[in-house]
Amino acid sequence: MATKKFRCKVCGHEGDKAPEKCPACQAPASEFEEIKEDTAPAKKGIDRNSNAYTIIYSAVMVILVAVGLAATSQALRPLQKQNEDNDKRQQILRSINVTVAANEAEAKYNELITDAFLIDENGQKVGDAAEAFAGEKAGYPVFVATVDGQTKYIMALNGAGLWGPLWGYISVNDDKNTVFGADFSHQGETPGLGSEIATPAFSQRFLGKKLFVDGVFKSIAIVKPGKSVEGQDYVDGISGGTITSQGVHKMLFDSLKSYEKFLTSNQ
């Protein structure tokens, strides 16, 4: 059993009992009070300097940030998809020599592109317009445009450059042989060198070139500036961008070869 303690309220003297007079200040016994000890355990606060607190705090913050980013991404996804689609429409339109702003791309695309479909290597249709534009289903997209009353066929190109993928679109007249226009894009080619394939100065070199010679598919060669090649049409490559130019050369042949049956059919 705990011993009682008493304290003088006048001078603070403590003792095991309340005397008639305080031995220190002579205050009467009425000035003594019993010292009450708090037996309840002290509540411990959070130790913000502990490793556990740091780990828990960091984990909570990471979760909150991740949730916030995910929510933002979901909210912005429709706008991102619209921007991606308009960029694709701009590329397709540039391949028929039509350049428009992003906010005008959808309207101009709907005006000029009269049909679209997917084909297989035999030139047979295997997908509709939506599938051709989405590019998610296996096959080769064809976009049919009407420009000044004349039919143009647009085909997709895919390849690899020095530092990353190359892609683009090339259009031909209704003879399915003569190039009407082209547009090329890249991811990461060297600025001022390989990146020049994305400029009109390069794509315009293809206008009027032929994909077939005497009925045989040849594609269009990319050669070093000043050089030539026999037996097929060719254009000058990019000075200082040899590997990128070779990538475009291979991309044209490999991609257009998949369209050969379509280009020689009566579709």
Regions found by a protein language model. Give the residues of each.
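The −1 position to Zn-ligating cysteines in a subset of zinc-ribbon hairpins
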Residues: 7, 21-24
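Short, non-ligating residues that shape and space the ligands of small metal-coordination modules
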Residues: 17-18, 29-34
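Gly/lys/ser-thr-rich phosphate-binding loops in alpha/beta enzymes
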Residues: 23-24, 30, 51
